[in-house]
């Protein structure tokens, strides 16, 4: 068994064989000779027609070299950048560590990595000019992001652009905008400075303020400067200034000025700005004008550049932003500029797609309406946000409707008829009326129908409300309350609702609005498009994922490299992976992956000099109509919702179940695959996992980094993995040492462990219930006078006897038979003649009675000559009907039993308090130790022992704060209990002679079964102070999970919170009062609690203090940081105290890490530095106090320094919406490792090592791609010989024994699919190294074909019962679903020895019953009905 477990573990982590044994060369591709032949021809000729192309082969999407780009934060030209990296060579050149600015799928500005740069030549270009002075020269096929007059936002080829289209430009750019004296001096010099014939620098200005400022800066910056002022001019003589000025070129912003752009711009504008109806700055030429435009964009100021090289700021918003961010030093210019804010001249608005927005409004019945087609950027964001708020509400409402409409409104009238008395009692409808409804004689009203359904346990309220509301609100009609039509209406509405939610145009419209609401773009109108001919050198940058960057003469959103698609390994050699993509288009769950991969793959240039790429669409012949439409749409637009993950965390990273059990993500994979864990914790609380993946990070090209936080938390993740930070989601690449991330304080130390034990011993609990029944005046036999008074165990005895008597009725005696039997002796043989005289009946009549007595086994007869003798074998009783059984039971047990009760007993039914309690306990609380509900039960029990008590009337009371009780009530509901409303009362008490008034809060639960269960767990009824406390045995014997939750409930109720002041905490304890008679038991209880705490490495002590009324026993958690940290992060509190306690724990964690990890490192550096210098210098360099350094030199023990934050400061500055802001203190690159990730259904995040992780690879929501052409290779199924050959090769490599039977079984299931065959082989190998047909069918969840055929033939031959038994055997043996069975029946029906018309008929029937299953019909009933159809058709033939 150990060997088997080891093998399974390896299989979880091993690369799937379907990838491991993928064909590496064209020669290895089998069964596709027609394709291989064509592909080899393409290899030979280098030509590739009839495949997906994003542009004509050999033509890239590129820019001319003078286009500007911000690379690694510096402004340069793309030509200079690419030439420097590529050393002038044509084609692609890989590059690392280069980043540019671009936009994400929401139109937000982000820093993006460049994968490679590209240089090429072309004979055609398109020149584009815009209203704000942008001038771009790009290849005709270069896509640009534009807003067209019809409102669409899309990537359009340059050659297709028209005047009036609006080009996307960023609303701001990050830049170096700090103040800097030298940059300011350069601004003055570039603005109004020059060099005279004596090589002096001259600054000329009418403003006395500017001349004074220029002189101040000159004295400060240049020590040898001689300054003279004369007639509005300042003359500077200095060798330093002379050298500086000679190195400058006034045509561009100098390198020194980029370090303080704000200062440079202010000085430059002070000198050169002219203010009329706009701010106009004359420059030395277009180069510096364009650079100034980029610099202004760093502050979100959009500027125009005219043909003369003037920079123009005209829009009031941009003028206002200029004054706020840069401003003028000259007061006169400042006032003139302020006057411009009232005017509006610049139009950077966006055309909106009114038709698409109207479609969304109509479909989702939105109230908001706006008629204009041109919106300003601010208006677009404002309106889109208003619409999105409504949309979120509507989509949430529709999801609720979908859930409600998925439930049928049809009830089972046969079940109603069986339970008519019970239903009548619950509903108040008479039994006769219910019978008439059940038999169809009368129709109930809708109100009565709902009541009857509710009595059956079917809740129809939500479904009916959904039917009426959805119909009226979204479909525009009012539905009658005729029950006959409701189910049809429900089905139709559910169909319409699903169509609405899957409406691609609606999804596109919602995505469009999201883009409008979130983008950070403006739109510059194109005024001229001109085609150029000649010989041009062109350049481009490849930016993976988002495929765009900010560049151009003025900041513009540009698309990166896209080229044709190409072939395979032989064609591309070592570069084949960059140029080849294989997709499975038929997998419905993979449609979104197809969209994303096609989009990203088609945008990159081929590597290695090839002219095109190729996309393989595997199993294209299996594409459904929906899949074909989805694939077509993917080629046309970017919109999709990708749920696969490419960026992940390492295997040691811990994720958390919703009840905060931690599990290493590598182990989670196994639990998830086996169905043990289906949910994890994330930002929204709990979320369902829909996918989990593992692979080596090298596959996606992202190395793994280790991040260490100031709390000591460590996490390892790929570079593109995203974590939640105070500024939003950030990739690991972008997180630096000193960066801040958000941490969700989580409990730790309690692992998820599969534990199949159940928490209740049902046999012991049933025996305990006798005590409960006796308390309710039920009695055992010999004490009870009637059956009703009996305890349940004795009712069971009578039930068994009643069933025995029912079995004897067939052989029971009539009154006359009993009389004759009484006359016959058991000791001696009596002659028949003598018996005839005693009985006084005729010989014939006596012979008939004797024959019956002999047949029933009461007598035996023998014949001697002509005489016949009779002897009794056993006694008998008159037993022919229920009344006879009633009489016998009353005689044997000595109690009165009603006739109605006897009838119930004879039908096998018995009722009793213990049965009712046991049934409810089994249904609600008989769970495994690893079940989440076990933790809730433990938590509630802990709370009851603290702030609850059991009343004698079966009620359970809880007393606490209102907030605490509201949280507790949620747990009680999860247990299937119905807590009361919270009761609020005034209270008063006296403390040291002083009256104190307040309010108390209570709630209660009335549930006899839960009350009995708590008593079984030794929770006492009444006053616990007098009776004492006990830790339930099931808790003591349980796993860490239930022990932790019990402690949390107990401390949540009765524990005190930690009291913190500045750096330190104390005060965590439990305090319980006891009387003399309960003292020993209470102390034992707290000793047990202390033992439980020790399992979490928490130390505590117990004290006993006498009082006037008795004793106070305290359990005190030992007050030191390490112990408190263990308690708060491993145990903690349930309910209201929980949040505060977690924050205290996180503070202590940071404090201890600072004290034990960070400070020792600083101390070591302090000693080293102070030894070679002095204490004062060391303190200044390290940023600590001098006392700290001196104490380290003295060898004094390290303590918290005064500059460490206090707890009060932590709560104020570090806590954000329940998260803790923590700094990254160390970042290390680990290289390529095996990584893991999970994907959640509702929110793309999960908690990992306390950090909030994102399922990083989400896709674009709105931007549309270039139209593409595609011709698909059609792959046919492989023949069995080809698959068998490959399987034998794999089996040999893996050391497997592949039997012939096992091989044939795999071939049968694979149906020509090589990947399916390999996957089945790998799965079977996890069971046994010998591959047999038995383990193949087991892992594939398939029945043997011969079993399916046998079942169908039995039915066709009229042997329905045996066919039915065979069906049940298949379902139980193989664990198949009904649909699985139908699929195999459909396949095997064509292999039956019957004529073709019958095969056609049966195939049609199988399809009909499959449809019924899809519609939600009962599996077993439908499968048996299908076999019945087989039987009927067989008889007809």
Curated annotation (Swiss-Prot):
Gene Ontology, cellular component aspect: DNA replication factor C complex
Post-translational changes noted in the entry: This protein undergoes a protein self splicing that involves a post-translational excision of the intervening region (intein) followed by peptide ligation.
Gene Ontology terms, MF aspect: ATP binding; ATP hydrolysis activity; DNA binding; DNA clamp loader activity; endonuclease activity
Domain of life: Archaea
Keyword Endoplasmic reticulum assigned: no
Keyword terms: ATP-binding, Autocatalytic cleavage, DNA replication, Nucleotide-binding, Protein splicing, Repeat
Residue ranges of domain DOD-type homing endonuclease in the record: 185-301, 940-1098
InterPro entries to which the protein is assigned, alphabetical: ATPase_AAA_core (IPR003959), Cro/C1-type_HTH (IPR001387), DNA_pol3_clamp-load_cplx_C (IPR008921), DNA_Rep/Repair_Clamp_Loader (IPR050238), Hint_dom_C (IPR003586), Hint_dom_N (IPR003587), Hint_dom_sf (IPR036844), Homing_endonucl (IPR027434)
GO biological process, one term: intein-mediated protein splicing
PANTHER family linked: REPLICATION FACTOR C / DNA POLYMERASE III GAMMA-TAU SUBUNIT, REPLICATION FACTOR C SUBUNIT 4
The protein's role, per its UniProt record: Part of the RFC clamp loader complex which loads the PCNA sliding clamp onto DNA. The complex possesses DNA-independent ATPase activity.
Other facts: The intein interrupts the potential ATP-binding site.
Similarity section: Belongs to the activator 1 small subunits family. RfcS subfamily.
Quaternary structure and partners: Heterohexamer composed of four small subunits (RfcS) and two large subunits (RfcL).
Name of this chain's protein: Replication factor C small subunit
Gene assigned in the entry: rfcS
């Amino acid at each position: 068994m150990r060997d088997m477990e080891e093998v399974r573990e390896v299989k979880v982590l091993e690369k799937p064989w379907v990838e491991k044994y993928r064909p590496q060369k064209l020669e290895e591709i089998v069964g596709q000779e027609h394709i291989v032949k064509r592909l080899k021809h393409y290899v030979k000729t280098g030509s590739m027609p009839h495949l997906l192309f994003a542009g004509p082969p050999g033509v890239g999407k590129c820019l001319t070299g003078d286009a500007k780009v911000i690379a690694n934060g510096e402004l340069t030209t793309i030509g200079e950048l690419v030439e420097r990296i590529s050393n002038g060579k044509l084609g692609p050149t890989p590059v690392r560590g280069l980043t540019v600015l671009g936009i994400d799928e929401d139109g937000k500005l982000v820093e993006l990595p460049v994968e490679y740069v590209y240089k090429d030549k072309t004979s055609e270009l398109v020149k584009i000019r815009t209203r704000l002075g942008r001038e771009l020269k790009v290849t005709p096929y270069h896509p640009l992001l534009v807003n067209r007059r019809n409102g669409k936002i899309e990537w359009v080829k340059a050659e297709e652009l028209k005047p009036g289209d609006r080009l996307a430009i960023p609303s701001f750019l990050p830049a170096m905008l700090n103040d800097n004296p030298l940059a300011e001096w350069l601004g003055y010099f570039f603005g109004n400075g020059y060099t005279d014939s004596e090589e002096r620098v001259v600054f000329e200005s009418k403003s006395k303020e500017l001349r004074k400022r220029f002189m101040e800066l000159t004295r400060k910056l240049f020590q040898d400067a001689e300054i003279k002022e004369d007639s509005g001019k300042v003359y500077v003589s200095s060798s330093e200034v002379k050298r500086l000025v000679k190195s400058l070129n006034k045509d561009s912003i100098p390198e020194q000025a980029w370090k303080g752009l704000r200062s440079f711009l202010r000085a430059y504008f002070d000198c050169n700005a002219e203010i009329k109806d706009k701010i106009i700055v004359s420059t030395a030429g277009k180069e510096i004008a364009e650079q100034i435009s980029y610099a202004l964009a760093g502050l979100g100021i959009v500027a125009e550049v005219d043909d003369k090289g003037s920079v123009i700021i005209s829009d009031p918003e941009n003028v206002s932003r200029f004054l706020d961010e840069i401003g003028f030093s000259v007061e006169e210019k400042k006032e003139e500029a302020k006057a411009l804010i009232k005017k509006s001249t610049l139009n950077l608005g966006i055309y909106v797609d009114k038709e698409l927005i109207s479609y969304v409004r109509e479909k989702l019945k939105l109230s908001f309406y706006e008629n204009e087609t041109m919106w300003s950027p601010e208006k677009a964001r404002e309106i889109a946000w208003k619409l999105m708020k409504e949309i979120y509400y509507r989509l949430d409402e529709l999801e609720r409707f979908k859930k409600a409409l998925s439930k049928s409104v049809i009830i089972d009238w046969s079940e109603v008829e069986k339970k008519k008395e019970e239903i009548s009692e619950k509903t108040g409808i008479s039994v006769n009326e219910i019978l008439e409804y059940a038999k169809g004689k009368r129709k109930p009203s809708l109100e009565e129908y709902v009541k009857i359904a509710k009595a059956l346990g079917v809740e129809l309220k939500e479904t009916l409300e959904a039917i009426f509301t959805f119909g009226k609100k979204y479909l525009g009609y009012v539905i009658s309350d005729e029950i006959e039509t409701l189910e049809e209406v429900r089905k139709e509405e559910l169909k319409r609702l699903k169509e609405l939610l899957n409406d691609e145009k609606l999804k596109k419209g919602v995505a469009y609005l999201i883009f409008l609401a979130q983008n950070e773009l403006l739109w510059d109108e194109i005024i001229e498009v001109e085609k150029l001919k000649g010989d041009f050198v062109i350049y481009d940058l490849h930016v993976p994922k988002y495929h765009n960057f900010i560049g151009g003469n003025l900041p513009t959103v540009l698309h990166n490299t896209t080229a044709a698609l190409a072939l395979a390994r032989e064609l591309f050699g070592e570069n084949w992976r960059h140029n080849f993509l294989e997709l499975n288009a038929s997998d419905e769950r993979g449609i979104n992956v197809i969209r994303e991969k096609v989009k990203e793959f088609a945008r990159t240039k081929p590597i290695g000099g090839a002219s095109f790429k190729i996309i393989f669409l595997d199993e294209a012949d299996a594409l459904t109509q929906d899949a074909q439409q989805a694939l077509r749409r993917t080629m046309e637009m970017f919109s999709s919702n990708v749920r696969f993950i490419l960026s992940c965390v390492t295997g040691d990273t811990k994720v958390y179940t919703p009840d905060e059990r931690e599990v290493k993500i590598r182990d989670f994979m196994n639990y998830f695959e086996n169905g043990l864990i289906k949910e994890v914790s994330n930002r929204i609380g709990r979320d369902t996992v829909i996918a989990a993946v593992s692979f080596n990070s090298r596959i996606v090209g992202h190395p793994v980094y280790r991040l260490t936080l100031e709390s000591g938390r460590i996490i390892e993740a790929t570079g593109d993995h995203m974590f939640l930070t105070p500024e939003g989601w950030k990739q690991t690449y972008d997180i630096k040492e000193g960066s801040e991330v958000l941490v969700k304080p989580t409990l730790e130390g309690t692992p998820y462990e599969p534990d199949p034990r159940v928490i209740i011993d049902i046999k012991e609990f049933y025996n305990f219930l006798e005590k409960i029944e006796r308390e309710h005046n039920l009695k055992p036999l010999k004490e009870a006078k009637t059956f009703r008074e009996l305890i349940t165990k004795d009712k069971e005895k009578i039930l068994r006897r009643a069933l025995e008597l029912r079995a004897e009725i067939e052989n029971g005696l009539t009154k006359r038979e009993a009389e004759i039997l009484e006359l016959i002796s058991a000791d001696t043989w009596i002659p028949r003649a003598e018996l005839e005289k005693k009985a006084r009946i005729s010989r014939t009549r006596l012979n008939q009675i004797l024959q019956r007595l002999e047949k029933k086994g009461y007598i035996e007869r023998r014949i001697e000559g002509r005489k016949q003798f009779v002897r009794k074998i056993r006694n008998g009783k008159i037993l022919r009907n229920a009344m006879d059984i009633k009489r016998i039971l009353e005689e044997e047990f000595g109690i009165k039993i009603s006739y109605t009760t006897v009838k119930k007993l004879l039908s096998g039914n018995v009722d009793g308090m213990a049965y009712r309690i046991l049934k409810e306990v089994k249904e609600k609380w008989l769970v495994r130790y690893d079940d989440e509900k076990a933790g809730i039960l433990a938590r509630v029990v802990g709370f009851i022992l603290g702030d609850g008590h059991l009343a004698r009337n079966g009620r359970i009371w809880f007393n606490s704060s209102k907030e605490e009780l509201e949280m507790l009530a949620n747990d009680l509901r999860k247990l299937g209990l119905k807590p009361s409303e919270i009761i609020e009362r005034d209270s008063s008490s006296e403390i040291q002679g002083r009256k104190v008034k307040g309010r108390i809060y209570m709630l209660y639960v009335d549930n006899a079964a839960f009350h009995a269960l708590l008593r079984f767990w030794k929770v006492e009824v009444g006053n616990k102070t007098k009776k004492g406390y006990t830790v339930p045995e099931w808790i003591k014997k349980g796993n860490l999970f239930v022990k932790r939750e019990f402690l949390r409930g107990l401390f949540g109720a009765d524990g005190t919170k930690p009291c913190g002041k500045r750096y330190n905490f104390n005060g965590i304890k439990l305090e319980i009062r006891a009387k003399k008679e309960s003292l020993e038991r209470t102390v034992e209880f707290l000793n047990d609690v202390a033992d439980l705490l020790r399992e979490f490495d928490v130390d505590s002590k117990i004290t006993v203090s006498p009082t006037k009324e008795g004793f106070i026993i305290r359990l005190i958690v030992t007050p030191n940081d390490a112990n408190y940290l263990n308690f708060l992060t491993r145990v903690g509190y349930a309910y209201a105290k929980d949040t505060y306690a977690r924050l205290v724990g996180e503070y202590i964690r940071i404090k201890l890490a600072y004290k034990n990890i960070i400070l020792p490192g600083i101390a070591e550096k302090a000693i080293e530095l102070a030894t070679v210098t002095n204490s004062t210098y060391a303190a200044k360099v390290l940023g600590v106090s001098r006392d700290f350094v001196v104490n380290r030199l003295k060898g004094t023990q390290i303590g918290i320094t005064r500059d460490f934050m206090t707890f009060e400061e932590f709560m104020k500055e570090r806590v954000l919406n329940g998260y803790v802001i923590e700094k990254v203190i160390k970042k290390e690159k680990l290289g390529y490792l095996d990584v893991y990730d999970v994907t959640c259904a509702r929110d793309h995040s999960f908690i990992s090592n306390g950090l909030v992780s994102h399922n990083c690879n989400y896709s674009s929501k709105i931007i549309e791609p270039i139209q593409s052409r595609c011709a698909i290779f059609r792959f046919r199924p492989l023949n069995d010989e080809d698959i068998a050959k490959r399987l034998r090769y794999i089996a040999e490599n893996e050391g497997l024994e592949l039997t012939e039977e096992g091989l044939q079984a795999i071939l049968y299931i694979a149906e020509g699919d090589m990947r399916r065959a390999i996957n089945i082989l790998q799965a079977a190998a996890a069971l046994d190294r010998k591959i047999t047909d038995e383990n193949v069918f087991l892992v594939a969840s398939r029945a043997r074909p011969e079993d399916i055929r046998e079942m169908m033939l039995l039915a066709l031959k009229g042997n329905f019962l045996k066919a039915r038994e065979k069906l049940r055997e298949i379902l139980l043996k193989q664990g198949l679903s009904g649909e699985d069975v139908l699929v195999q029946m459909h396949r095997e029906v064509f292999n039956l020895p019957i004529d073709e018309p019958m095969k056609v008929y049966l195939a049609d029937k199988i399809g009909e019953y499959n449809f019924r299953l899809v519609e939600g019909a009962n599996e077993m009933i439908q499968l048996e009905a299908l076999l019945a159809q087989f039987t009927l058709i067989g008889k007809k033939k």
